[in-house]
A protein has these predicted regions:
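Flexible coil segments in periplasmic/lumen-exposed cytochrome c-class electron-transfer proteins
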Residues: 33, 102-144
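N-terminal secretory signal peptides that target proteins for export/translocation
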Residues: 1-9
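The canonical Cys-X-X-Cys-His
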Residues: 46, 50-61, 113, 117
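Bacterial N-terminal signal peptides
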Residues: 12-23
Length: 144
């Protein structure tokens, strides 16, 4: 094969090499749920606590409260919390909610409530419960 013929094959070889190299580079998945952050039983306890302490303001479906609380699922939740940490969400809920008695529920109840919110926003349950300790939650991301 002469030199001119070999040069003519360079674009094809470059394209083949680019395709092969590109397929070996891992690409982060889009819209994949975060690692499991809570247990299903915890979310069930959180649902009971939600009915008792949160439902009047945020509604039975987390987005239709009688007293105008913001939606706790869907786009609003993703915008407000979806790029942060579980610790930030837990910290806010445990310090500011419910408005008539902020911080008055037990740490475990607040963790259960956060688990319930996560379950309603597409985060999958796992085997371990969300710890009721903000320091233990620092590296738990809500990013997907």
């Amino acid at each position: 094969m002469d030199m001119i013929a070999r040069l003519g094959q360079l674009p094809r070889l470059a394209l083949t090499a680019a395709v092969l190299l590109g397929s070996a580079i891992p690409v982060p998945a889009q819209d994949q749920p975060a690692a499991s952050l809570y247990a299903a039983a915890q979310a069930e306890r959180g649902q009971a606590a939600y009915r008792q302490s949160c439902q009047d303001c945020h509604g039975s479906s987390l987005d239709n409260g009688e007293f105008g609380g913001p939606p706790l699922k869907g786009g609003y939740f993703r915008t407000r919390w979806g790029q942060g940490s579980v610790a930030a969400l837990y910290g806010y809920v445990s310090l500011a909610m419910p408005p008539d008695r902020p911080g008055q529920l037990s740490p475990q109840t607040y963790a259960d409530l956060v688990a319930f919110l996560l379950s309603n926003n597409g985060y999958p349950p796992g085997d371990k419960e969300l710890p009721p300790d903000q320091n233990a939650q620092q590296n738990m991301s809500l990013k997907r």
